[in-house]
Amino acid sequence: MIWKTLIVAFMATAVLAQEIDLSDQRREQYRNMLAAQCRKMGAEDKVKDVESSVRNFVECLRGIVDPQAIKKEIEEAKPKGELDEVFKKYCAKAPVLKTCISSLLDGVRPCVDKVAIDHYGPLLNTTNQLIDFVCYKDGERIALFIAHGGSECFKNSTEDLKKCAEEMKNSFPSVEAAKAMSLPDKCGKFDDLTTCMVTSLEKCENPTPANMAESLLKFIRKDSPCNAAVPKD
């Protein structure tokens, strides 16, 4: 049900964010899908409000980080061994990002069903903890990841990672079958995906990216219902 919230947010963002490479036709398609979802929830009059909340979210992200600027800063800091200073600066903005995400979830609420809304708490908690994970010790983890070739490792492993995702997707015969699957079985699928991704990244010359990816995925699992349903060491 969390995915319903994310899908509504994505559709609205795709309509508004010019940085997303979409044709006018595709953008209009997402606009119509958003309107249909709001209409389904009896909130067709709230479409503009939802779009406004997403517009504010996009502006919030722009205020936190400029992708081109941070890319340049990383390139300049990496040979000097000063990546920690770059991420320390951006991680200082983590509280603002958390507020932006919370506001976004509140903004799309009118067009999301009650079951999905009931998952808002866990979703917000998970996103906050992911931000805390990335920004642990002022961004030490992400700085180490970049310094040890994390970006290059992921780029070189793109095809293998895609295969992992495809295997996961193909393991579900249908949407209905996925919904009917028991929680332990779903957790097993997540564990299989984790193993596949980590194995792919372990082919890189430096083990750090694989180790950090594994730590992140374990962190996500620990904060999910899987931790109680299928405990792991």
UniProtKB/Swiss-Prot annotation:
Looking up InterPro entries in the UniProt record yields: DUF1397
Q: In which tissues is it expressed?
A: Hemolymph.
**Do the record's keywords include Secreted?**
yes
GO cellular component, as recorded? extracellular region
Sugar-bearing residues?
N125, N156
Q: How is it modified after translation?
A: N-glycosylated.
Report the locations given in the UniProt record. Answer: Secreted
The name this protein carries in UniProt is 27 kDa hemolymph glycoprotein
Biological source species: Manduca sexta (Tobacco hawkmoth)
